[in-house]
């Protein structure tokens, strides 16, 4: 067997389901701005760029249902549905755009 490369992942065969069993909220998002907007996997989606139009109350306490370390990019004029999952753990949101800075 060859030596492992630093950072290399060796997953088992088959598919992995991210956030298995977590409730999912689907929201329609439109970029009304004139520049692309990128939102990362663990950003509190309700606090995303103001140029994104969507139901922010439905997104409160949630993040994108995508792999950690990845992001979704919304080009100007784009409109698409995204899936969100609730933050877990202590459910404390601090930073981002400072709209909550505390417990959810």
Swiss-Prot record:
Alphabetical keyword list: Cytoplasm, Hydrolase
GO BP term (any one): urea catabolic process
Pathway note: Nitrogen metabolism; urea degradation; CO(2) and NH(3) from urea (urease route): step 1/1
InterPro entries: Urease_beta-like (IPR002019), Urease_betasu_sf (IPR036461), Urease_subunit (IPR050069)
GO molecular function, one term: urease activity
Root EC class: hydrolase
Known EC number: 3.5.1.5
Subcellular localization: Cytoplasm
The keyword rRNA-binding is assigned to this record: no
One Gene Ontology term, aspect cellular component: urease complex
Catalytic activity: urea + 2 H2O + H(+) = hydrogencarbonate + 2 NH4(+)
Quaternary organization: Heterotrimer of UreA (gamma), UreB (beta) and UreC (alpha) subunits. Three heterotrimers associate to form the active enzyme.
Family membership noted in the UniProt record: Belongs to the urease beta subunit family.
HAMAP family listed in its UniProt record: Urease_beta (MF_01954)
Designated name of the protein: Urease subunit beta
Organism taxonomic ancestry: Bacteria, Bacillati, Cyanobacteriota, Cyanophyceae, Synechococcales
């Amino acid at each position: 067997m060859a030596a492992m490369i630093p950072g290399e992942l060796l997953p088992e065969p088959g598919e992995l389901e991210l956030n298995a069993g977590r409730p999912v909220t689907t929201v329609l998002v439109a970029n009304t701005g004139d520049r692309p907007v990128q939102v990362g996997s663990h950003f509190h989606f309700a606090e995303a760029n103001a140029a994104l139009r969507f139901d922010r109350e439905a997104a409160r306490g949630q993040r994108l249902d995508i792999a950690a370390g990845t992001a979704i990019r919304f080009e100007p004029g784009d409109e698409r549905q995204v899936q969100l999952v609730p933050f877990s753990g202590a459910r404390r949101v601090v930073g981002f755009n400072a709209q909550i800075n505390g417990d959810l």
